[in-house]
């Protein structure tokens, strides 16, 4: 079985692609929900292709077409386009109903063409449905919130980014104790703490600046701190989940989407957990 060797990119390529990704992220936060839908869809499609390619390295099957169709349909469903009537009214029940329908369809396919790996294929496809397009679609919900949508998106994204940056810097400077040596030897307890601390510091400052510019901040003070820490913790869990998957497959990067930074899943792994966690918290707080 072939394993993909890591690519050694020049430092200049890593830095340049890193800045491109950073400004693209700011653009996503700034734009309105309909405008960012194509960006989210593109990330979802590329992520699915990377996911299917990694499973093939293990000699495993996945219903890639089913994953891609779900990704295309779940975004209009999240945007509420089903309320427009016509053929789109099939999307009106929402993405959760769409997930149930696709899950049932997968089992029907398995029953029609049973083979030794039928249930394994269903399981891997369901994991892909939830992990990539479903979780990613909550970015649209956060940005679409009335009044606080801009601030909520900024709060969630900055909390995730702070978790990544703080974890990297603190881990390089003070990392001593491995957090998950079997999954990712480079990640340390000190790095995880650094990510949480930076998120706790970034969230309230960002909300203060946001209000100073005339926008509406969804949370303030201690509330913003607690929110930032919770989202950062979810982001770190998402990072570890992707490390678990890559360790199981036997690859260093999920792809070559960004030079020196790996694939799309390598870049959005933290967001895939941080964004839905942030939206859930906003719902629990009555802000969504």
Residue map of PLM features:
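Interfacial loop-to-transmembrane junctions
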Residues: 247-270
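Membrane-embedded alpha-helical bundles of polytopic integral membrane proteins
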Residues: 1-229
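Juxtamembrane boundary at the C-terminal end of a transmembrane helix
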Residues: 280-288
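Membrane-embedded alpha-helical segments of transport systems
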Residues: 166, 193-194, 265-273
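Hydrophobic alpha-helical transmembrane segments of integral membrane proteins
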Residues: 129-130, 255, 272-273
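Short helical (or helix-break) motifs at transmembrane helix termini and adjacent helical loops
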Residues: 161-172, 235-247
